[in-house]
Amino acid sequence: MFQSTFFLVLMVCVATARFANKDHCPPNEEYNECGNPCQEKCDNGEPVICTYQCEHRCFCKQGYVRLTEDGECVPEEFCKPIHY
């Protein structure tokens, strides 16, 4: 009985968290049901090599990259080096 109740509560929590995030993405981000967790970042310029796996969460919009691993999404031009 405990296992079935625990499983039911767990499924409700997962479903709630999954659908609650769709409308609450930070600026310059959008929700993706199956996004690649290896996003471009300013500090590396390219995504790292990793296995493709679906992640359902907010990702940077087209033309934006992460400032840092868990940072905000900024325009790609923001990361380009300044030449003097």
Curated annotation (Swiss-Prot):
Its main location: secreted. The keyword Metal-binding does not apply. It comes from the Eukaryota. One of its GO terms (cellular component) is extracellular region. Residues 1-22 form the signal peptide. Keywords: Allergen, Disulfide bond, Protease inhibitor, Secreted, Serine protease inhibitor, Signal. It is found in: Secreted. One of its GO terms (molecular function) is serine-type endopeptidase inhibitor activity. Transmembrane segments: none annotated. Residues 25-79 form the TIL domain. Disulfide bonds join C25-C58, C34-C54, C38-C50, C42-C79, C60-C73. Belongs to the serine protease inhibitor-like (TIL domain-containing) family. Inhibits alpha-chymotrypsin, but not trypsin. This is Chymotrypsin inhibitor Ani s 6. It comes from Anisakis simplex.
